Structures are given as C-alpha cells and as structure tokens.
Amino acid sequence: MKALILVGGYGTRLRPLTLSVPKPLVDFCNKPILLHQVEALVKAGVNHVILAVSYMSDMLEKEMKEQEKRLGIRISMSHEKEPLGTAGPLALARELLTENSDPFFVLNSDVICDFPFEEMVRFHKHHGKEGTIVVTKVEEPSKYGVVVYEAESGQIQRFVEKPQVFVSNKINSGLYIFSPAVLDRIQLRPTSIEKEIFPAMAQEGQLFAMELQGFWMDIGQPKDFLTGMCMYLQSVRQKHPEWLHVGPGFIGNVLVDPTAKIGQNCSIGPNVTIGPGVTVEDGVRIKRCTIMKGSRLHSHSWLESSIVGWSSSVGQWVRMENVTVLGEDVIVNDELYLNGANVLPHKCISESVPEPRIIM
C-alpha cells in the first residue's frame, strides 16, 4: 500500500521552530512529527510513502533517505514548483499513486493521534466507494468546518463551515483513504480538497466518514503542540507505560531520552519530554514542557508550558511560562522572567519579557 503525506507548507504557525527545520522534522515527544506518522503507516502495511514537498525539501530528503533504509520501505519525493493546495499534490503524484489499483492514504503533516490505519482500510473496503475521511469529535464545533453524515452507514451528506447553530460536532481530522478513481476529479492546479473535491464527492454518495476513537490533535501551533504532547503521553501511559520515566522527583507522565542528564533535587512533570543530550542541572522545576536535543537548563530554573528548542541554554533562576518558545540555539541569561516570549533562533536574551511578544 501507498501513502501520500502533505509536507509542503512553510509551518509559519509553529515558528520559531520551523525557521530551523521544516515542520515535519520538528521533534514531537523526542521523534520528528513525520516519523510518528510514517512508523504508524508501516505498521499498517504501507511499503511506499510519497512526500509532497516544497519548503526545505533538501533537509526532508536527507532525513527520509536514512529512515527509508531503517524501515525497509520506499520513500519518494514529489516536488511542488508552486503551492498546489491540499488536492493539487495528488494530481502531481498521480503516476506514483496509480502504479497499482490499491487504495492509498493521504495525511496532513501536522496531525498526531491514535492512527487508525488498519481500521480505515477495512471500513473503506466495506463501503466500496471512492473516499473515506476520518472524523473526530470536538467540544466547540463553531470554530471548525463540520461533517454531517448518516450515523449508521457513515455516508457523508454535507459540510458546514463554522456553524452558528449545532448541526454536528464531528470535524475532518486530516486523515483520508481513497480509491485511485478519485484522481480523475483532480487537475494539476492549486485546488482545495476540502472545499472543491469533497463536496462534489459527497453529493454523488462517494464519500464516507469513519469516527476516530482515540485522541487527536492538530499540533501546528505551539499551544496545540503542548496539548498534543499531553494527550500523546497519556496514550503512552495506557499502551507503553515502560517508556515513561519514573523515580524520585518525577511526577506523572514524563519521557526522558536515555542520553539526557538530570541533576539532584529536581521536580519534573507532569507532562514533560526531555530530548537526547539534554542537561538539567540541580533544583530545576519543569512541568508541561518539551526540552529539545542538546539543550541545558541551569540550576533552579522554573519552566511551565514552554518549548525549549535545540541546543538552547536557560540560565540560573530563570522563570519561563505561558507558551514561551525558544528557537534553536537561544541563550537566556540568569535571573530573567519570560512570559509568552517567542524567541527567534540564535538570540541572546539579556532582559525579562514580562508580556507575550516576538523577540527578533
């Protein structure tokens, strides 16, 4: 089986992290976002992954060549010369997708969830039509475009954009499976699959919805990235509790790379991931944070709801909170307060940031 992953965007919502790497290569719980998706696809029997690339494609290609060998699968690059929206990339990759008559997966690159790929194949084959969308339940449907479908069969009737009165609380989760016939609907031009292709398919009775049972998050911006981390760690607690770090000073769900060094009298957790080669000095307090590869947290620093980018340094007695994000190789001097700061790569912070703002 094949899968196409839409990885061509600039990832502007996840800056400053995406100024250093393309969004699919940002580390989420100590593994690039893209790798979470690819490994789940391989587990479900996918042996050929096609990446629809444009921004920083060289970096993606280099990383995925290594993964291709490790996973024993074929990974192809489909290069967009201009932005093609969410449907155009399918037309561009048509030759690769139609090498056989099997259905194929299509994924948005910033989705993290309990990937239901095997169930999708069964559901899609059962109804026998052109397309299946995975839908997920949300608390506030008025923020989203919702999917209205028959409860028993899953046949989609219509889509409603940001409804003001309740019609459905199910939204498109960005995971699809299609039969190759769907490609006859898509031309090689900038096209929205959600606004142009799906409504026509629904009208013809060719599109079905399958409800996701586990957690789901679009982690395309820092606030949601941290929420997604909490959900993922809870899922790890249920499925692979042995992956989590336990011991004195560790609270709740904490993921620590074996190469990280943790000092004395720290309080870490709940909901923390600590990456490879990270050093946490004595007396540090961390909760609801991601600390990426090669960073150092100096003694008695206090971090909550923050993301520390690769190879950054947080000084002694620093306090960081309220979705503060440090890009790659940022230095925060001692005894400063950062409240919702968004710090671009390679900066040195020498004064406090009492109100949320971007540091350029």
Curated annotation (Swiss-Prot):
Q: Which reaction does it catalyse?
A: alpha-D-mannose 1-phosphate + GTP + H(+) = GDP-alpha-D-mannose + diphosphate
Query: What is stated about the way this protein's activity is regulated?
Result: Enzyme activity is reduced by incorporation into the GMPPA-GMPPB mannose-1-phosphate guanylyltransferase complex. Allosterically inhibited, when part of the GMPPA-GMPPB complex, by GDP-alpha-D-mannose binding to GMPPA.
Name the cofactor(s). Answer: Mg(2+)
Q: How does it assemble?
A: Component of the GMPPA-GMPPB mannose-1-phosphate guanylyltransferase complex composed of 4 gmppa subunits and 8 gmppb subunits; the complex is organized into three layers, a central layer made up of 2 gmppa dimers sandwiched between two layers each made up of 2 gmppb dimers. Catalytic activity of gmppb is reduced when part of the complex and binding of GDP-alpha-D-Mannose by gmppa induces allosteric feedback inhibition of gmppb.
Quote the record's binding site residues for Mg(2+). Answer: 110, 218
Note on domains (UniProt): The N-terminal substrate-binding domain adopts a Rossman-like fold and has a binding pocket for GTP or GDP-alpha-D-mannose. Substrate binding is coordinated by an Mg(2+) ion.
Q: Which InterPro entries match?
A: GMPPB_C, GMPPB_N, Hexapep_transf_CS, Mannose-1P_guanyltransferase, NTP_transferase_dom, Nucleotide-diphossugar_trans
The enzyme's main class, written as a single word, is transferase
Q: In which pathway does it act?
A: Nucleotide-sugar biosynthesis; GDP-alpha-D-mannose biosynthesis; GDP-alpha-D-mannose from alpha-D-mannose 1-phosphate (GTP route): step 1/1
Q: In its UniProt entry, what is this protein called?
A: Mannose-1-phosphate guanylyltransferase catalytic subunit beta
Q: List the disulfide bonds.
A: none
* A family per Pfam: NTP_transferase
Q: According to its UniProt record, which protein family does this protein belong to?
A: Belongs to the transferase hexapeptide repeat family.
Q: Which gene encodes it?
A: gmppb
Region (Substrate-binding domain) residue spans: 2-222
Please give a single GO biological process term from the UniProt record: GDP-mannose biosynthetic process
Q: What is its EC number?
A: 2.7.7.13
What does it do? Catalytic subunit of the GMPPA-GMPPB mannose-1-phosphate guanylyltransferase complex. Catalyzes the formation of GDP-mannose, an essential precursor of glycan moieties of glycoproteins and glycolipids. Can catalyze the reverse reaction in vitro. Together with GMPPA regulates GDP-alpha-D-mannose levels.
Q: PROSITE patterns per the record?
A: HEXAPEP_TRANSFERASES (PS00101)
Q: Which domain of life is it from?
A: Eukaryota
Extract the ranges annotated as region (Hexapeptide repeat domain). 245-360
What does the entry's cofactor note say about binding and number?
Answer: Coordinates binding with substrate and required for enzymatic activity.
The UniProt keywords, alphabetically, are: GTP-binding, Magnesium, Metal-binding, Nucleotide-binding, Nucleotidyltransferase, Transferase
The GO terms describing molecular function are: GTP binding; mannose-1-phosphate guanylyltransferase (GTP) activity; metal ion binding
